[in-house]
Amino acid sequence: MKCEKKGNLVNRQVTVGQEDLEQINRLTRREFSQEELYCFRVVLCDNDVDRQMERFDEETLEQLARMFVGKTGICDHQPKTANQLARIYQAQVEYFPGKTNLLGEPYCAVVAKAYMVRTESNRDLILEIEAGIKKEVSVGCSIRESRCS
């Protein structure tokens, strides 16, 4: 069974601190400076009921958060080299006080920090992210079994 969950960018840009830079540079072949990078936060998946009437529980979200680190974000679900746009360098489950899911439970989501190297070829993409035009992501995954909750 395959499932897809949608998420959204939760802010325009992340201020790259020393800890962020260290995490990013663990994933790169050379060290990058703050000025060379564009970083942003994005909601990857959550505990809300989706259009297939499925949801992730909190334990699964915690497991997914660990698995997303180091994964590359691609464009249009096409795993080609040219479509690799960003890499996730940190992910964790976050709670949003006062917000509940469709079941009335406290809402939580896997929120990731991702980075891109600033280049001429992605300048327009960064502007579209900052303008809120490019704001949604889709996460694909496979599961071994399906259980009713």
Predicted regions and their residues:
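Signature of dsDNA virion morphogenesis modules
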Residues: 1-149
